[in-house]
């Protein structure tokens, strides 16, 4: 596992232990809006929060702008390679905002195609509020997740200096990469292992694709793209039957539902012996999904940074709403049953799920951000 990130997270948690509770209380500050925070510098982020909730996320919606903001966090953060540094080459700065500062370079990289639109939408907020691009990308991603029902309470730390050069190409995994390639890449970036790779991919629960199939945009990865739940982990294990658009695109394989896309890397990671059981473990297990993603998101947003030199401003991030009560945590979409599951975990049986009533599920597209 990513022991460096785990150690940092534990160290931060210990700083808030009961032994230091009195000191923590003394340090809390009250902002002009009446909210209390652990550090007075966090107060300025409430203005940023109000602004982006209204003017970027359209009143706090878990829509296309939220999905792309979450994607931007990963593509900025994962662009770091200690292996390249060991060879005397620049290996990228991780979560440093380079994808926004050098957007003319980095958004032209193949895995970053389409991110130029969310970068253009976010840039004016960075300029208006005077925050660093790295901090803003992490903040917008955390707020975006809070807009998706079921998401964990996200952590947010400030203190990322602006990037001084663009990250090199080739550091962001592609949909057509093999499982070995992707595991090796995340291990190089942050000593993440194959289980933590699965945790990262939980973000696909609230995601859609605009650029894999050139004939259609806004294709979700699962049937509940506006909810942070485990449906992504259910539906990626269902047998693919058709393409939602033209088909035959690099990095795309058949999906089980009309209107839903499946990328090759998700398909293979869900079925690889090293990752299949961890993948299945999220089915009908919302608490594990929430805990593991909360941890991995923080670890990603601190890649290339010194966590001990950062300021915890997590108080500013809203809590997400619960999953709607009329839906189980995991289910088979209408028209699907256990017979459609391609069982890959040899250790435990696939969980027992109910099938939603009604005609076969057809997944609605998500309109992409303006200009995409």
Curated annotation (Swiss-Prot):
Site (Transition state stabilizer): 71
Binding site for Ca(2+) 1: 76, 94, 96, 98
Family: Belongs to the peroxidase family. Ligninase subfamily.
Listed cofactors: heme b; Ca(2+)
Protein name as it appears in the record: Ligninase LG3
Provenance organism: Phanerodontia chrysosporium (White-rot fungus)
SUPFAM superfamilies: Heme-dependent peroxidases
Compositionally biased spans, kind Low complexity: 350-361
Region of interest called Disordered, as start-end residue ranges on this chain: 350-372
Record's cofactor remark: Binds 1 heme b (iron(II)-protoporphyrin IX) group per subunit.
UniProt GO BP: cellular response to oxidative stress; hydrogen peroxide catabolic process; lignin catabolic process; response to reactive oxygen species
Binding-site residues for Ca(2+) 2, renumbered to this chain: 205, 222, 224, 227, 229
Active site: 75
Signal peptide feature range: 1-21
Gene that produces this protein: GLG3
GO molecular function: diarylpropane peroxidase activity; heme binding; metal ion binding
Residues binding heme b: 204
PANTHER family assigned: CATALASE-PEROXIDASE (PTHR31356:SF66), THYLAKOID LUMENAL 29 KDA PROTEIN, CHLOROPLASTIC-RELATED (PTHR31356)
Pathway: Secondary metabolite metabolism; lignin degradation
Domain of life: Eukaryota
Lineage of the organism: Eukaryota, Fungi, Dikarya, Basidiomycota, Agaricomycotina
């Amino acid at each position: 596992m990513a022991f460096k990130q785990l150690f940092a997270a534990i160290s931060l948690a210990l700083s808030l232990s009961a032994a230091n509770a009195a000191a923590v209380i003394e340090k809390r500050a009250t902002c002009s809006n009446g909210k209390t925070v652990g550090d007075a510098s966090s107060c300025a982020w409430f203005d940023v929060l109000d602004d982006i909730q209204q003017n970027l996320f359209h009143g706090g919606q878990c829509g296309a702008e939220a999905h792309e903001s979450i994607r931007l966090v990963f593509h900025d953060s994962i662009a770091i390679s200690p292996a390249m540094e060991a060879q005397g080459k620049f290996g990228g700065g991780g979560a440093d905002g380079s994808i926004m500062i050098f957007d003319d370079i980095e958004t032209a990289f193949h895995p970053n195609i389409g991110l130029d639109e969310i970068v253009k939408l976010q840039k004016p907020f960075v300029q208006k509020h005077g925050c660093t691009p790295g901090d803003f990308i992490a903040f917008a991603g955390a707020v975006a997740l809070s807009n998706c029902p079921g998401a964990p309470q996200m952590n947010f730390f400030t203190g990322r200096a602006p990037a001084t050069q663009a990250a090199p190409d080739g550091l962001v995994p592609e949909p057509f990469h093999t499982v070995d390639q992707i595991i090796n890449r995340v291990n190089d970036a942050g000593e993440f292992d194959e289980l933590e790779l699965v945790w990262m991919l939980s973000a696909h629960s609230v995601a859609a694709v605009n650029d894999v199939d050139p004939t259609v945009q806004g294709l979700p990865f699962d049937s509940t793209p506006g909810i942070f739940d485990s449906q992504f982990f259910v539906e990626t294990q269902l047998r693919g039957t058709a393409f939602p658009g033209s088909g035959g695109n690099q990095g795309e394989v058949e999906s089980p539902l009309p209107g839903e896309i499946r990328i090759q890397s998700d398909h293979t990671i869900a079925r690889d012996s090293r990752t299949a059981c961890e993948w299945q473990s999220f089915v009908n297990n919302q608490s594990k999904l929430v805990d593991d993603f909360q941890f991995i998101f923080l670890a990603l947003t601190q890649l290339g940074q010194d966590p001990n030199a950062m300021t915890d401003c997590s108080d500013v991030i809203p809590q997400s709403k619960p999953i709607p009560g009329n839906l189980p945590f995991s289910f088979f979409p209408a028209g699907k049953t256990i017979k459609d599951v391609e069982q890959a975990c040899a250790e435990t049986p696939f969980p027992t799920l109910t099938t939603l009533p009604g005609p076969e599920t057809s997944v609605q597209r998500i309109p992409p951000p303006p200009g995409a």
